[in-house]
Amino acid sequence: NNPEQQTDQFIENGSISKDMLTNNYDILYESTFALEQVSPFTVRLATAERTWYSYQTDSLSLLEAIIPSGENHRYTFNQTMNILFRHTKSLNLYLNNFEINGLESSSTPILINISAIDNSIRIQRFVPKFN
């Protein structure tokens, strides 16, 4: 797989940069929950639909990935994890094997921040800006 094909694959599947999110979307709502688990953390993503997302764990670089339909992706981290999903259709998210609630099925982006530093899970749902 050469990098150009990989880039095209992400564009085809709806890659969203932080700038695109800021310029093209507004926050519909934000919810914050207490983080009740302790480090180290394991996040498992499961979906019935092919889903693009980007993620950053602890102080590592931002990465992009695609979950093929019916598959799971798993990540471990100690302090923080940020995950941006293009959509949450048929998406389930688990932290240390406990499902994170509040991820209703939607075709709009969602940003999830899990922070051991703040002892919180923050969920932000976005909607397209009306110009």
What are these regions (language model features)?
Residues N1-N131:
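Extended low-complexity, proline-rich intrinsically disordered regions
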